[in-house]
Amino acid sequence: MSFVERFCNSKDALKNKKFIVVGDFCLDRYMYLDSRLDQRFDYCDLDTYFMYDEKLYPGGAVNVAKNILSMGATVICIGLIGNDGNGYDLKRVLKNYGADVDCLYKYDNRITNTYYRPIRRSDKKDKYMNELLFINPKLTGVDQEKDIIDALEKNINVVDGIVIVEQFDKDSCSSITPKVKKYVNSMANKFSDKFFLVDSRSNINKYTNMYVKCNQYEFMKAM
């Protein structure tokens, strides 16, 4: 019976297994506002909204790692984050879930991918406001690609499978650059005994020798 068949037929299929999750690690920051606290100050003609709470949730590859961990597996996280407060919080969230974050590499010239989601309470109702997306705008450097590839090569022999998570359209700024794609495709061909799965919003047609996860819109976009 193949790994996929075991996974579909047993809730314990991932128990005691070890996986790499590589790709775009993101942090979701939910900011809770209360209209009763609104104020206007003399230095600005706009109302000032006050936050009364903030909660952090996993996004992108962080959420994938969390779900795999919840099924009893071990997860090694491989990716790029910024040397910033959001990167610190993202690693803290992953550590709390029990993930190995030694291969999440911090760079001063990168921004940690973060979704800001403000929710404003007014008249006893919560209104979801425009989402603010803070993503890395700079091209991924050769040294950063090398970090990803070296970490994959170092850990491939100790895991049962690899899950690739590509969250954004512009792969040249992502952890999964065209060069990294080429490398994971070669790995999937070489290590055919291991489980490979890719979750990509825009580039599923660029992967070979692995299982693909996409919704109907992503599928049609790739056709």
Give short role names for the model-derived ranges.
Residues Y43-D47:
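Active-site gating loops and adjacent loop-to-helix segments of metal-dependent hydrolytic enzymes
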